[in-house]
Amino acid sequence: MQNLDPQELEKFEKMAKSWWDPNGDFKPIHQLNPTRLQYIQQQANGLTEKKVLDVGCGGGILSEAMAKQGAIVTGIDMTVAPLEVARLHAKEQGLVIDYQQITVEEFLQKQTALYAEKFDVITCMEMLEHVPDPLSIIQSCRALLKPNGVLFFSTINRTFKAWALVVLGAEYILKMLPKGTHDYDKFIKPAELLHWTDQANLVCKNICGYHYNLLTGKFWLNQDVSANYMATFQHKSI
């Protein structure tokens, strides 16, 4: 059984055409992208010539940004239309990105069968809260990571503040996101993420919150993880 939620996939299929519109449904992701890219570069000590896997890449906003920094990027997702958009946009930008429609669990099986090289950097951003079994995603990512590689997750804390900001505020009041984009019950507390990553034999190297400034339209990072947050992991042996 594939680790996916058909209703979640349908949401993003419907929004595919607006993926690269900086003022469309994915405006918050476009605004967030410079901040998360900078975080990834800092934690990974740069991306030039590093082999990167972007899990849940969607229309390729982060994949392209990392490729432009010199990374060798593979993007995987289970949606159809967003991947088509991603391939077309990368071609228009003159970027070579390997986009595949496949789950990370299936990708791992394929890589294992081919004895393929593992990845220096793996990103799984804004995805764990959209799948039935986050632990399975985490374990597969860990298995695909090089011994000295760096793994990134971002998600949303299950708090009243997060609901007020991400669901009520962003979806219903400010209408920054389509209604129904997020399901509060699927939000993930940092303690839960750390428990799952510990089970997967990963250690957290850094965790921080990211926050939106309505006046500037930009995101910034701090230590407040009560709403949106992202974290860096490595193998426990590192």
Curated annotation (Swiss-Prot):
Family matches, as SUPFAM superfamilies: S-adenosyl-L-methionine-dependent methyltransferases
Gene3D superfamilies xref list: Vaccinia Virus protein VP39
CDD domains: AdoMet_MTases
InterPro entries registered for this protein in UniProt: SAM-dependent_MTases_sf (IPR029063), UbiG_MeTrfase (IPR010233)
Any GO BP annotation: methylation
Residues involved in S-adenosyl-L-methionine binding: 36, 56, 77, 125
GO molecular function, one term: polyprenyldihydroxybenzoate methyltransferase activity
E.C. number: 2.1.1.222, 2.1.1.64
Pfam families from the UniProt entry: Methyltransf_23
Alphabetical UniProt keywords: Methyltransferase, S-adenosyl-L-methionine, Transferase, Ubiquinone biosynthesis
Pathway in which the depicted protein is active: Cofactor biosynthesis; ubiquinone biosynthesis
Recorded catalytic activity of this chain's protein: a 3-demethylubiquinol + S-adenosyl-L-methionine = a ubiquinol + S-adenosyl-L-homocysteine + H(+); a 3-(all-trans-polyprenyl)benzene-1,2-diol + S-adenosyl-L-methionine = a 2-methoxy-6-(all-trans-polyprenyl)phenol + S-adenosyl-L-homocysteine + H(+)
PANTHER family xrefs: METHYLTRANSFERASE (PTHR43464), UBIQUINONE BIOSYNTHESIS O-METHYLTRANSFERASE, MITOCHONDRIAL (PTHR43464:SF19)
UniProt record similarity statement: Belongs to the methyltransferase superfamily. UbiG/COQ3 family.
Function of the molecule: O-methyltransferase that catalyzes the 2 O-methylation steps in the ubiquinone biosynthetic pathway.
Annotated protein name in UniProt: Ubiquinone biosynthesis O-methyltransferase
Originating organism: Histophilus somni (strain 2336) (Haemophilus somnus)
Gene expressing this chain: ubiG
